[in-house]
């Protein structure tokens, strides 16, 4: 089955990311070790897809005095970035590393005026074609997300959503995205149900008909994929070492989408995505073109 509608070689991949960031990693085990890495869900997805031979464009808001630093940090990845003005600085997120755990202190969302948001919407309307893929992810203000979704669903059927928003099902307003990718906590909040065991989670997933493909990440347990007919579970792969879990979910989504575009079957796509997510956990930032990923086959079964 072809999940993406009318995708051709001329189709473009647009990543709408409200708030990119600079991730400042500090290793508390080695107090002198700190690293700055470009971050935010959209940037992470773009870096991974670029490493797989795709050429996505990130559409975002950037603000001074940290805008130039962000652009300098992202330059080695050779990404296409279309930016609009944020009235406040590009975020700096603090990531504290200690004993295989990452403590995250995330900066405030940027201040975006109605006029600046209108510029972004105008750009989307002028550039997105009906055979393009639009990925909406990251932090959004509710009103901005509502406007972006309302517009994008009129432009293409190939819409992917990875946004932590408790009222997401209301915002969809009967529109059906191609893919939704919540993690387990976001999924529970979105459907206002909390699970005490795997069976209750499975039952809830099988009742979820708000998208064509539900890709749900469940931390170190693995990932679920529901295509409105079959529910597939792929167990996680133990990484060689745990450096930081930041970006693992973004990597999972990026690799899954890349394989979807290449018309790889869903099971193989999710297995490959799981391998890449494991590799991301073994480093700072997400996997890129310099990383060599050896694919192993984890446990997988239909539920």
Swiss-Prot record:
The active site is at residue 250. The keyword Nucleotide-binding applies. GO terms for cellular component: cytosol. PROSITE patterns: PFKB_KINASES_1. Pfam families: PfkB. Disruption phenotype: Not essential, it can be deleted. Catalyzes the ATP-dependent phosphorylation of fructose-l-phosphate to fructose-l,6-bisphosphate. This is Putative 1-phosphofructokinase.
């Amino acid at each position: 089955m072809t999940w993406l509608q009318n995708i051709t070689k001329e189709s473009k991949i647009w990543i709408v990311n409200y708030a990119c960031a600079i991730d400042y990693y500090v290793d508390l085990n080695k107090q002198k070790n700190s690293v700055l890495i470009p971050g935010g869900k959209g940037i992470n997805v773009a870096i991974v897809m670029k490493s797989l031979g795709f050429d996505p464009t990130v559409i975002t808001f950037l603000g001074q005095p940290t805008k130039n630093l962000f652009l300098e940090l992202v330059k080695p990845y050779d990404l296409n970035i279309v930016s609009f003005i944020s009235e406040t600085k590009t975020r700096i997120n603090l990531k504290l590393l200690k004993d295989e755990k990452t403590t995250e202190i995330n900066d405030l969302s940027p201040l975006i005026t109605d006029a600046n948001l209108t510029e972004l919407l105008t750009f989307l309307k002028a550039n997105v074609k009906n055979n393009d893929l639009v990925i909406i992810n990251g932090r959004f203000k509710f009103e901005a997300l509502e406007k972006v979704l309302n517009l994008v669903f009129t432009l293409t059927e190939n819409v992917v959503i990875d946004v932590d928003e408790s009222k997401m099902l209301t915002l969809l307003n009967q529109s059906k995205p191609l893919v939704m990718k919540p993690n387990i906590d976001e999924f529970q909040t979105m459907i206002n149900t909390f699970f005490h065991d795997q069976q209750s989670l499975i039952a809830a997933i099988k009742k979820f008909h708000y998208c064509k493909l539900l890709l749900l990440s469940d931390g170190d347990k693995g990932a679920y994929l529901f295509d409105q007919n079959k529910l597939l579970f792929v167990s996680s792969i133990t990484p060689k070492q745990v450096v930081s879990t930041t970006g693992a979910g973004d990597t999972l989504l990026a690799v899954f989408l890349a394989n979807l575009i290449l018309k790889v079957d869903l099971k193989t796509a999710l297995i490959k995505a799981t391998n890449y997510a494991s590799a991301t956990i073994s480093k700072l930032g997400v996997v890129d073109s310099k990383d060599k990923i050896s694919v192993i086959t984890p446990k997988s079964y239909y539920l």
